Amino acid sequence: MERKRDVLILAASYMLCAVPLSHATISAGTSANTSTGATTGVAPVSSHGKRLLANQPDLRSNSVLVLDQTHSSVLYSRRADVAMPIASITKLMTALVVLSAQQPLDEPIEITRDDLHGGRGSHSRLAAGMTLTRGDLIHLALMSSENRAAHALGRSFPGGLPAFVQAMNAQAMLLGMVHTRFVDPAGLSSENVASSEDLSKLVIAASENPTIRRYSTDKAYAVRAGRRMIDFRNTDSLVLNPTWNIIVQKTGYIAEAGKCLVMQAVIEGRTVVIVLLDSFGKYTRVADAKRIKKWVEATLSEGLIHNS
């Protein structure tokens, strides 16, 4: 009970200290279209309420939110308040709950048969009987989207998976994620849903944790399996791109969710949060992120986004 109470207290502190964009602020910028489920982006507005650029980026993701976190303004929105399956974006919340509970990162955790059930679409290089530290499991869940690592983190939580999922939903509620529901720690269930608005709050909260920042943006990591080392790579190719300054990121995919990508990045000196849900095609989410970056850079260089 003491640890569960700590989870709630720490989650509340994230909400109060780490999320400068209120739900009211986001809704004000998106209600023109998202409440009706429209699939075209609303005209972006500055923090002064002025319209910016007519030629918005041609994005292929079904739900999009682009926030200028530095100036607390919505730059682009499409169906941002619609709850959708979020796949492995879930693992950001999994990491946040584990780290908020202050469980020891050096504690060894064995991968068991319970972690192998995975479900359809699940792929993992972690075999039953392997033992990794909790820190390694978080690292692999965030960087390589390891489903068995995420499941083991939830299973080893005080009270097991039911208590862990309860803590995930409690933290979501405290962060103001009103369209969010979690049923598993890996994101393999299509019942894990959230809106782009909600995920922007999760990204901002996660970015306050240095462990999440580091692990989610590492390019590669290796763990020992008996006498051999297993190499893992980041699922987000953008972390390898030197033109990007990514602070935190997470990819996701299941059939019901499409390709998903969330990130916080510095673009032209501004902290920008990008949420892309339900993209189809192997490279669509990456291409959309690049289009957004190019668009923000262009509007800044043309003075169409205010600097004050």
Please report, for each region that a protein language model flagged, where it lies by residue.
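C-terminal segment of classical bacterial N-terminal signal peptides
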Residues: 16-23
